[in-house]
């Protein structure tokens, strides 16, 4: 009985000491593929939600490439959304707003230091 308790404590300590085991990223590719919701279809495909990327029927290399490219595309879409919000807020030209929004500057040209107000 004492040996069982000692082993239980030892394994629990090892598990919690390695925080990667407790995170989604710490799971192996095969395990991630079974718990992720991915779009239907066949072949290697990925589903991205926030910082989590799930792959189905992919090699680790293909999954990594899909997730990297997908996250970049999601970031670009977010920039375009910010651009559209900026233009709708002030009625400025699309080119001006997008250059401001893409640079991460405040969308309001007046507070961004541009003299057009």
From Swiss-Prot:
Intracellular or extracellular location(s): Secreted
InterPro entries (alphabetical): SnTox1_CBL (IPR044057)
Taxon lineage: Eukaryota, Fungi, Dikarya, Ascomycota, Pezizomycotina
GO biological process: effector-mediated activation of plant hypersensitive response by symbiont
Region (Chitin-binding domain): 87-117
Protein name: Cysteine rich necrotrophic effector Tox1
Domain of life: Eukaryota
Membrane-spanning parts: none
Induction summary: Expression is induced in planta during disease development and peaks at 3 days post-inoculation correlating with the onset of necrotic lesion development. Expression is increased in the absence of toxin A (ToxA).
